[in-house]
């Protein structure tokens, strides 16, 4: 099975070390463009663009990278409860059309009550997933070309429709990650690829089995992906030394503050990440070559595969044997590490190198009439 390898655009900051300004660098458009172009040339399938108040806006960043890349896809967040499904569907179709079919979407429900409150969202965990399920149902139907009337608990639309369809049919693929039962049920029923953070293989296997069974109950098959950091070097010793350097500027106070911030979230996945290290520096290798040091201060994905190219490739193939076909990777700093992964790791894997998409001709059309419909040719009698 060929593997889809993704990289990451660090719109929330980048540098050589975690938890310090030492060794950091400006993350401006030029720098993000360098990373995107490197990923494009090295054969990555796409890039994940993060979302939230600590990041630049993912949609604007993705749109700005379209003209400077050729085959790279953009995995961009959909935010139920923050955006209406109709507006999100229009945005999704536009991004797909302007990028010639290079748009992918990642459903993000949110987990930090403080940040959500700042965005005007006051739903609890279960309510957010109810709203997300309704949002996704309407979003998908719109991209399928339906005119949608929907009267749910959280979402209400009447006569919603898209005038401009996406390039990818039936619609651009929808990704999603969540560890709670309600999250897995949503994934099983509505999404195309279920993402997990980088837990030890036995825990990932358990997750995959649960989601696969739930999807089968809905008569569906679902793909799987995993989100990991990577520290790959020419030797295992060099890789482990690089891992230690990454957290060499962390002090106990910074770790404690970060863990306190994570504790206020209601994300089951974040709780599982935190439990891998319990905020302590010792015993960070939680599974062969799987290191939890990143999660001491970074929210979300908090583990890294560490080793030389053949060693990291062996660990990746262990995950692939569980049914994972997509790997969303990152490393610090992201420009240099994109090259290291491409040069030291890719040769040891069966990497699916994306082709440059051929331009998709769009049907000629006149201006929309009354902002309501696209004019068509009148049949001659």
From Swiss-Prot:
InterPro entries: Alkanesulphonate_mOase_FMN-dep (IPR019911), Luciferase-like_dom (IPR011251), Luciferase-like_sf (IPR036661), SsuD_RutA_monooxygenase (IPR050172). GO terms for biological process: alkanesulfonate catabolic process. Keywords: Flavoprotein, FMN, Monooxygenase, Oxidoreductase. CDD domains: Alkanesulfonate_monoxygenase (cd01094). Gene3D superfamilies: Luciferase-like domain. SUPFAM superfamilies: Bacterial luciferase-like. It catalyses: an alkanesulfonate + FMNH2 + O2 = an aldehyde + FMN + sulfite + H2O + 2 H(+). The keyword Transcription does not apply. It comes from the Bacteria. One of its GO terms (molecular function) is alkanesulfonate monooxygenase activity. Its EC number is 1.14.14.5. FMNH(2) which is absolutely required for this enzymatic reaction, is provided by SsuE. HAMAP family: Alkanesulf_monooxygen. Catalyzes the desulfonation of aliphatic sulfonates. NCBIfam families: alk_sulf_monoox, PRK00719.1. Belongs to the SsuD family. Homotetramer. This is Alkanesulfonate monooxygenase.
């Amino acid at each position: 099975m060929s593997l889809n390898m993704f990289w990451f655009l660090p719109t929330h900051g980048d540098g050589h070390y975690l938890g310090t300004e030492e060794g950091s660098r400006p993350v401006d458009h030029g720098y993000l463009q360098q990373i995107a172009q490197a990923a494009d040339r090295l054969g990555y399938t796409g890039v994940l663009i993060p979302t939230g108040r600590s990041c630049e806006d993912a949609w604007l960043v993705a749109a700005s990278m379209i003209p400077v890349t050729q085959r790279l896809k953009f995995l961009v967040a959909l935010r139920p409860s923050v955006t209406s499904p109709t507006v999100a569907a229009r945005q999704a179709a536009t991004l797909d059309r302007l990028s010639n079919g290079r748009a992918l979407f990642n459903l993000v429900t949110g987990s930090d009550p403080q940040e959500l409150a700042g965005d005007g969202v006051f739903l609890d965990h279960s309510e957010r997933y109810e709203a997300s399920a309704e949002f996704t149902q309407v979003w998908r139907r719109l991209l399928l070309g339906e005119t949608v009337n929907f009267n749910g608990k959280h979402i209400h639309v009447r006569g919603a429709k898209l005038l401009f369809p996406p390039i990818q049919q039936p619609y651009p693929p929808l990704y999603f990650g969540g560890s709670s039962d309600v999250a897995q049920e949503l994934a099983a029923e509505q999404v195309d690829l279920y993402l997990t953070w980088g837990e030890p293989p036995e825990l990932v296997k358990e997750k995959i089995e649960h989601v696969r069974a739930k999807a089968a109950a809905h008569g569906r098959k679902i793909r799987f992906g995993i989100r990991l950091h990577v520290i790959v070097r020419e030797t295992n010793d060099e890789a482990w030394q690089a891992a230690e350097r990454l957290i060499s500027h962390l002090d106990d106070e910074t770790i404690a503050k970060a863990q306190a911030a994570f504790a206020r979230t209601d994300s089951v996945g974040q709780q599982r990440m935190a439990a891998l290290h319990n905020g302590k520096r010792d015993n960070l290798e939680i599974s062969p070559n799987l290191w939890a040091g990143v999660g001491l201060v970074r929210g979300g994905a908090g583990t890294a595969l560490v080793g030389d190219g053949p060693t990291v490739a062996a660990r990746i193939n262990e995950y692939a044997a569980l049914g994972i076909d997509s790997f969303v990777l990152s490393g610090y700093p992201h420009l240099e590490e994109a090259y290291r992964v491409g040069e030291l790791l890719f040769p040891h894997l069966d990497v699916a190198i994306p082709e440059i998409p051929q331009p998709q001709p769009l049907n000629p059309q006149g201006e929309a009439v009354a902002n309501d419909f696209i004019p068509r040719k009148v049949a001659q009698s």
